[in-house]
Amino acid sequence: MPAYRSRTTTHGRNMAGARGLWRATGMKDSDFGKPIIAVVNSFTQFVPGHVHLKDLGQLVAREIEAAGGVAKEFNTIAVDDGIAMGHDGMLYSLPSREIIADSVEYMVNAHCADAMVCISNCDKITPGMLMAALRLNIPAVFVSGGPMEAGKVVLHGKTHALDLVDAMVAAADDKVSDEDVQIIERSACPTCGSCSGMFTANSMNCLTEALGLSLPGNGSTLATHADRKRLFVEAGHLIVDIARRYYEQEDERVLPRSIASKQAFENAMALDIAMGGSTNTVLHILAAAYEGEIDFTMDDIDRLSRKVPCLSKVAPAKADVHMEDVHRAGGIMSILGELDKGGLINRDCPTVHAETLGDAIDRWDITRTSSETVRNFFRAAPGGIPTQTAFSQAARWDELDTDRQNGVIRSVEHPFSKDGGLAVLKGNIALDGCIVKTAGVDESILKFSGPARVFESQDSAVKGILANEVKAGDVVVIRYEGPKGGPGMQEMLYPTSYLKSKGLGKACALITDGRFSGGTSGLSIGHVSPEAANGGTIGLVREGDMIDIDIPNRTIVLRVDEAELAARRKEQDAKGWKPVEQRKRRVTTALKAYAAFATSADRGAVRDLGDR
């Protein structure tokens, strides 16, 4: 039977000093021997998705104590990708994921915690904590801060649902007046919580439900709604229960690697494809699988993307649909329920809260449950009042959205498209693959060919787009923005937003070895692997080269013969695979350390230390 890890520091004569220090934190004689649970919080006043988390860590801690555990809270960093966007701050976003994972490992292992509750929310925080949970493999429960309410605004007599991306697009559109831009800006992000569409943060919080590591409703219950409090309360009790099951009953089924197995990762990816999640989720799922030593690769994602249909379209793919609408339609358990009806998930995977995922779906899918408690839970609605306070309103929808033919969530028989919301493309420009969010691509450009407009950085691409140097029919190529080449693999939300503002959202393609914000839509192809800095073919593209993109057939091809590519490669080898133009970019020691070990996106941009 496994011993409680914490007894390393709480038992034995030689631990008198450690116990003395524990006592100084408030522990008493009766606490030594109880499971010590780390409450891993990520509160910060920099990020709207985390600004309301300050007191929630202590809420969980009180419930842990009430359940017979000892709670010890610490904090991780949290970067706001939206605020860091469009300048060198974005170089730090993806590397912060590794810092978060490492910091959780450092604190948990240094103090010998027995289990942990991870309170996350935004883009890199949930992935970083997920990586840590799979790396440490101690009992863990995830509970996120929840999504923001969508903005609402009346412009010229018409009501619009808004999010962050609308503010960015409006600001870059010369046809939108300064007055209207200000109105949109003030209305786009009305409450605390993760940005309101199916962007990276919400996508990842939804995936924790499919992985079995969080409670039903974690991905879709609004941050402001009183119903969300129950998730934090239950997480506190649940973690003590599963910690005892592992340490006192030797039940390894409650460990993260037992719950988040390869089959669970396939369930999560099937969900991601069905709901048209952010392309960043691919990066993070691969990284989490790597930490858990799970054999889950781009080939698995490609296989799943060919058989799982798109069952939901949420902003940015469908501008007037947000997470509050997904919740009203039954949330993630109902999307999983539709996949289950189509035989597209594994029902037998365990979860932290139910014996199997199938049991959870049967209880929580609003189209199959008879529980009025469950149905009432999914009636939780936005309050429509700007606030930074969690659980501050209790509005309800009058009716649920159970329309599986034309509603927010569709059945397998009535999908938005038979092809899923994400696809892996391969070809000579992306030998190890690249990712496109097909849910955000207009049907008219699923096949696209055009001449390359090559930019050596996001900054130069933005200047070129705003200066009208990009024309309809062009394929914008942004390179040397990968994990190593950036470094840090910047998001390209500004280039795609500016293409939209110029009326080119359905007339151009954009490919990059960088990545995209979850708020990106259009023919935006990212994660091109190998990246330019690693000798990838994207580094050989020249101005005017023709590029053919065929999403239905999953191909992307640079129309240059092999002999010419070989000659260009020899030339680049001599130059050391660096950008042609000098970039005004300060790469600090911290960023250099990340770049030294970062792999390309097809491996999740994890660090390769040569030990695997």
From Swiss-Prot:
Catalysed reaction, written as an equation: (2R)-2,3-dihydroxy-3-methylbutanoate = 3-methyl-2-oxobutanoate + H2O; (2R,3R)-2,3-dihydroxy-3-methylpentanoate = (S)-3-methyl-2-oxopentanoate + H2O
Pathway assigned in UniProt: Amino-acid biosynthesis; L-isoleucine biosynthesis; L-isoleucine from 2-oxobutanoate: step 3/4; Amino-acid biosynthesis; L-valine biosynthesis; L-valine from pyruvate: step 3/4
GO biological process annotation, one example: L-valine biosynthetic process
Binding site for [2Fe-2S] cluster: C122, C195
Gene Ontology CC: cytosol
Keyword Magnesium appears in the UniProt entry: yes
Keyword set includes Zinc-finger: no
Active site: S517
InterPro entries linked to this entry: Dihydro-acid_dehy_C, DihydroxyA_deHydtase, DiOHA_6PGluconate_deHydtase_CS, ILV_EDD_C, ILV_EDD_N, IlvD/EDD_N
Residue(s) carrying N6-carboxylysine: K124
MF annotations from Gene Ontology: 2 iron, 2 sulfur cluster binding; dihydroxy-acid dehydratase activity; magnesium ion binding
EC number(s) reported in the record: 4.2.1.9
A Pfam match: ILVD_EDD_N
Cofactor stoichiometry and binding remark: Binds 1 [2Fe-2S] cluster per subunit. This cluster acts as a Lewis acid cofactor.
Keyword terms of this UniProt record: 2Fe-2S, Amino-acid biosynthesis, Branched-chain amino acid biosynthesis, Iron, Iron-sulfur, Lyase, Magnesium, Metal-binding
Disulfide bonds: none
Positions that bind Mg(2+): D81, D123, K124, E491
Annotated PANTHER family: D-XYLONATE DEHYDRATASE (PTHR43661), D-XYLONATE DEHYDRATASE YAGF-RELATED (PTHR43661:SF3)
HAMAP family in the cross-refs: IlvD (MF_00012)
Similarity comment: Belongs to the IlvD/Edd family.
Function: Functions in the biosynthesis of branched-chain amino acids. Catalyzes the dehydration of (2R,3R)-2,3-dihydroxy-3-methylpentanoate (2,3-dihydroxy-3-methylvalerate) into 2-oxo-3-methylpentanoate (2-oxo-3-methylvalerate) and of (2R)-2,3-dihydroxy-3-methylbutanoate (2,3-dihydroxyisovalerate) into 2-oxo-3-methylbutanoate (2-oxoisovalerate), the penultimate precursor to L-isoleucine and L-valine, respectively.
Subunit: Homodimer.
Protein name: Dihydroxy-acid dehydratase
